[in-house]
């Protein structure tokens, strides 16, 4: 079942140090001044932090789900995701993964442990 913008916003807002900002009609989530998530005005897709070294493989493997960012944004760790093509678990993985790229490592590890993701 596709995810909704409200589900994405709720998860992103719940992450430590995350806050919502509005820039040129886009809903963005930041930690400090670093954007880790952006939602298209029409709610059809999101852009999120994603490791550059895995980006092309993700697009090649699932082109209905992932798309490369614009040429000017290729220098960033970023990918576009079709919301109609992902479920709640995939959305959670993508949003939490993007967030974990921009927070201090200790905070990402603490969050993972609290969520039951980390090994003891």
Listing of model-derived features with the role each one plays in the protein:
Residues 1-120:
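Charge-dense, helix-prone N-terminal extensions
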């Amino acid at each position: 079942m596709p995810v909704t913008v409200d589900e994405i916003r709720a998860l992103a807002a719940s992450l430590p140090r995350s806050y919502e900002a509005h820039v040129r009609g886009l809903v963005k989530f930041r930690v400090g001044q670093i954007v880790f998530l952006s939602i298209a005005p029409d709610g059809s897709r999101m852009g999120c932090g994603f490791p550059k070294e895995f980006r092309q493989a993700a697009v090649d493997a699932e082109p209905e789900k992932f798309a490369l960012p614009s040429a000017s944004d290729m220098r960033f760790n970023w990918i576009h995701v079709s919301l109609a093509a992902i479920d709640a678990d995939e959305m959670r993985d993508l949003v939490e993964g993007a967030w974990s790229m921009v927070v201090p490592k200790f905070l990402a590890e603490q969050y993972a442990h609290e969520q039951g993701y980390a090994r003891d």
